[in-house]
């Protein structure tokens, strides 16, 4: 089978919550990763309209991945140009490229909300990520497309998410920043064909998929999704998931779950994927840096499957 090369990045949540962003950049480089995915956080209280039955659950997830409070030196919704300059300088000094920005804020402020104030905040959040990405030199922001709830029907979620994204897309296109729609546990866009139809309905090269191979295991097969998404795949999250545990507790480190890595790699090769692979893992409670080392080793093992490999030297030089 033909070899192919991809570039490896690491997610901000892979570092302990209290660790300064500058130190995260340094550890990213020293542990062999070329790219870094920032998380947009905030010190602002939630809008009153944002509180729902799922708020406490979302906050619990944020706490579990260290995203429940702003990281020292990190990107915040209220960050100014001086803050962005500090972040950019720290990444450059470490020799790390900031490749994308994600946020948990779109779970509190979904694009699909029927409440105008919530949708407006969601649009502002995505635009904030776009502006930061322009300054920091990356090319993609991760966007949670919305969610279906007991109060928000599937049709309402579809219509509101499309309207919101139609308002954001011209802003992103003008600044040449891609929007990566991620498959999340939102009871929305549950099949690859539906996901493709949603993306294609915008007819824009600036909107595609940010695919998570572990999120999909509850209701699909990652290799099927990768093949169906094809050239719509803008970026991919690697983590693992144990189906025998289930729920949020089922997420685990690479090679310790049920993701069929051989089929994932084969599918990526089939669609000729050459983009970033971002490891979305969490730190160990003790010796947190060891999680970075183990993740790097796991990626080496994954990309040796079926005679597929990539050169770390090439990855680092491909910034």
For every predicted segment, state its role:
Residues 11-15, 39-43, 103-106, 146-148, ...:
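Active-site beta-loop-alpha junctions enriched in small/polar residues
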Residues 36-37, 99-101, 141-142, 236, ...:
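Hydrophobic residues within beta-strands of alpha/beta enzymes
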Residues 135-152, 175-181:
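Active-site groove signature of glycoside hydrolases
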Residues 1-135, 166, 173, 204, ...:
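N-terminal pre-domain/capping segments
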Residues 94-96, 138-139, 177, 271-275:
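A short helix->loop->beta-strand "cap" motif at the edges of active sites that frequently abuts
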Residues 77-80, 84, 115-119, 123, ...:
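Flexible, glycine- and charge-enriched loops at secondary-structure boundaries
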Residues 12, 17-19, 24-25, 51, ...:
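Gly/Pro-rich active-site loop or hairpin
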Residues 4-8, 23, 36, 156, ...:
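Acidic/histidine-rich catalytic cores of soluble enzymes
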